[in-house]
Amino acid sequence: RSPASLEALFAGAEGRDVTVIHCAGIVSIASRFDQNVYDVNVTGTKNVVDACVRRGVKKLVHVSSVHALPEKPGGAPVSETDVFSPGAVVGLYAKTKAAATAYALAARARGLDVRVVHPSGICGPYDYGHGHLTQLVQDFCTGRLAAGVDGGYDFVDVRDVAAGILACCERGRPGECYILSGRYCTVRDVLAMLHRITGRRRVRVMLPLWLARAAAPLSEQYYRLLRQPPLYTAYSLYTLSSGARFSHAKAARELGYTTRPFGTTLADTVAWLRRQGRI
């Protein structure tokens, strides 16, 4: 958030073939405005971009999000765009990622080779930050998940995203954006796969979205008192109900991007959580 904090990181970049991967950010499903999310996702990106230009960095790969992309009418698959506007997307997180992506791409006019990747719902092992799908897996395995909700989303393995980012560094084209998605999966299917992987009891209660939406404000307040991130908020329920599909055909074609089966991701996540003593 402070330009001065980047000086040591960028020291000595001048005159060298340097590529910066900007993947710092806060993933938030909060329904209310959060200054910290804005400061990190938008102001932080501006500071990194400005430092790249100032220090003569050759290449910047900006890790955006599929949330920065406007939805298509009728649930049509979402593909890449080169126009980003906070007004075209819903929710604080999406708006911050759209604003940050627009600023990063505009730096091409200042001589910076900018490329953008848009991961979908990142999941997988090695999640020390307690991401939302990891929390769902953990709650299922420990018997704390009493009910699921209708809806679904596109989930992608963090290891496939990492490989896609490196491929973008090497094979991506300046000024281009690449969706790094996985596959669409309903919450019901996620829970069924976890049952098969772990042998734990099934979650048989699935809340309709209208009921989950009605309870979301109380849920957010409850988890705020516990100082824990809620699994479901008004914004996350909007996302689960959107039915959004994302095409990674461009990344597959130009970057050689591939994804592993989602069941493998869940099994590896469960195994890692066990090794960590979290389940």
Predicted regions: what is each one?
Residues R1-T43, N47, A51:
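NAD(P)H-binding glycine-rich loop region in Rossmannoid oxidoreductase-like domains
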Residues T96:
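Active-site helix of classical SDR
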Residues S64, T101-P125:
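Conserved beta-loop-beta element that borders a ligand/cofactor-binding pocket
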Residues A99, H132, V149-C169, E176:
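Substrate-positioning beta->alpha
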Residues T19, T43-Y93:
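Conserved Rossmann-fold NAD(P)-dependent oxidoreductase catalytic core, especially the SDR/UDP-sugar
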